[in-house]
């Protein structure tokens, strides 16, 4: 299983390449050349070739998240767990991370679980969505079903902003 934490959780004393190689060094039987190639392939996949000799403190938050993604997929996991992968990122970078997670999930045929409060992410890349309230599953479905949901807790959470409430009213009045 690969994991992406809310903070990128990178080792400050390791370069970008060394951070991605870390799980390979710990858990694979590959030789150094194979591990380096695999890590570079992962960095290429997240568009970070050229940053491999930099340290986490020398790169942006969005780049740090992409390093974390590269590290998480280095061992070709069947499952990927992401805890608030867009935390602290601007909307444009959040969209890049969402698109990257979605395409990697498809490409590597992984099951990806994303824990998030970002409704843009939920609506944009969520395929099977589970809304949990106080530790219990409150609602399950697909993003297209959210707009018409009658679950009060779900709709209160999703439509907390006035703009989203107006959008929902417009959609439900069109039916």
What do the predicted segments below correspond to?
Residues 17-25:
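Short helical segment in ABC ATPase nucleotide-binding domains corresponding to the A-loop/adjacent helical element
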Residues 55-59, 63:
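Conserved ABC ATPase signature
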Residues 74-78:
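A short, proline-enriched helix->beta-strand linker immediately N-terminal to the Walker B motif
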Residues 80-83:
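Catalytic Walker B motif of ABC-type/P-loop ATPase nucleotide-binding domains
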Residues 91-93:
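Helix N-cap at the start of a conserved alpha-helix in ABC-type nucleotide-binding domains
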Residues 144-175:
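C-terminal boundary and immediately downstream tail of ABC-type ATPase nucleotide-binding domains
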């Amino acid at each position: 299983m690969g994991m992406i934490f809310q903070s990128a959780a990178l080792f400050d004393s390791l370069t970008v390449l060394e951070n991605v190689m870390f799980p390979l060094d710990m858990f694979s039987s590959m030789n150094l050349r194979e591990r380096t190639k695999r890590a570079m392939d992962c960095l290429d996949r997240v568009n970070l070739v050229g940053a491999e000799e930099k340290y986490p403190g020398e790169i942006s938050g969005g780049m740090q998240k992409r390093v974390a993604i590269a590290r998480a997929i280095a061992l070709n996991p069947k499952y990927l767990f992401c805890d608030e992968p867009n935390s602290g990122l601007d909307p444009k970078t959040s969209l890049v991370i969402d698109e990257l997670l979605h395409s990697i999930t498809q490409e590597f045929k992984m099951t990806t679980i994303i824990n998030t409060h970002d409704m843009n992410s939920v609506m944009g890349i969520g395929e099977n969505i589970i809304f949990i309230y106080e530790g219990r599953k409150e609602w399950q479905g697909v993003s297209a079903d959210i707009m018409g949901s009658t679950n009060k807790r779900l709709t209160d959470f999703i439509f907390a902003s006035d703009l989203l409430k107006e959008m929902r009213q417009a959609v439900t009045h069109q039916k």
